Amino acid sequence: MKKPIVVGSVAYDPKIVTIWDIIRDYFNDNGVRLDYVLFSNYEAQIEYLLSGKIDIAWNTNVAWVRTYELSNHKAQALLMRDTDIDFKSVFITKAKSGIKSVQDLKGKKFGLGSADSAQAAILPLKYLQNELDESIKDVEIVKFNSDLGKHGDTGRSEFDVLEAIKNDKLDAGAIGISTWVRVLEEGLFPAGEIESFYTSEGYCHCNFTALNSLDEKVKKTFVDMMLSQDPNEPIIKKMMQMEGLNKWVITTEKELKGYDVLTQAMKEQNLIKNNW
């Protein structure tokens, strides 16, 4: 019996078990053995991928950059969600704060999410530095390191930032675009109470990562099976809704450029080392 393709994923939410049971069953029902291993944090998952204990890792952008750099660029991004493309960070403030641009943050308190979150901390800090240069010293940075190891997947630190803004403990803060859309669509804050004043350029988020050494047939089989999923099939539709995508897409050179800004930021902030 052939060995299964072993995929790693971080269990940031109980729904992850359901998502991966559906994917595993889909593969197995179609004649391809697949199993998954759940991790409590991305640092452990990176270690297992680099040491060959798993074949493929469902990685955040931070985990991808670390894997790529620590493998001496001998890793490959295979596949991603359509929603991982053109992801953005948003700066939020109270509507009546008088803050209309990043320049208005001088002398203010600005909140960042978990230190290992690309969308809520790593990239926002870089954007602040780009916009303010030396004047960043005039901004009081407040960090909310909730759920470290999950790379911002839970979104908890972003809601900590929002609550602090609501309760006047912060003047402004950074969150990911998906959290901001959720706030607006679900009416999580009174209408007109908070607003955005800065939206970053688009960048890429998660991807399925494999080392170059993984058999090409295994890579192709995995990608082909994922792409063959029919989003109109009820069980697949359920999985995709839970995972937050409309379709899987192959990661090309164009998408890889969407990790350049994060790679630069992580190097500048000394975040490449994998501290597990």
For each predicted feature, which ranges?
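Extracytoplasmic/secreted proteins, especially bacterial periplasmic and envelope-associated proteins
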Residues: 18, 22, 44, 123, ...
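Pocket-lining segment of extracytoplasmic ligand-binding domains
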Residues: 111, 119-215
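An extracytoplasmic/periplasmic, membrane-proximal ligand-sensing/linker region
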Residues: 2-22, 203, 210, 214-276
